[in-house]
């Protein structure tokens, strides 16, 4: 059960009852207009990171977000910098080039990587062809990408990152049926639309680009139908 001390979940259950969401985090969610579980399920991603199309190190664009596939060549370890920050550094590479990867104040990120193992690093590549670098990237294995090839990127706020939002959303996805479906079954069948629950699960965690498209199509259709209904109701009162 994803909620703490709140055995019955409803769309109106406050988001603070989610595991790991304390009062301060709930306040940050509220800055995004997220107060209830329904609000969180309907906080849709603004884009996705596609881990299925990685670059080689040499071909990776610089100064923009991208995914690079590389093998861990060396793990020289970490050190403490002036001011108390801890720096961890590894060298990764492929058949042609090498990539220097650095993490600050995140020793576990480097320590969990295995020498000789291939990983997918998502971040911003800097430097020239002779020395390429990446700082604080996200890391995934091939097995993780097979299970979840697209990573949702959410609108965020200070103190509440997209990753933190994604963790909370994943808690709720098994309970997507909490949201009522405003579209009747005959309409879903006629226009070949996903159910509300399936669309919400797919928009947050699509397995393919086609699945993400189907989810967006359903949710856009719902929004347009709602707008038309409100316009019709307004006309009746004029």
Spans of features found by a protein language model:
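Extended, structured, electrostatic nucleic-acid-contact surfaces
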Residues: 2-19, 27
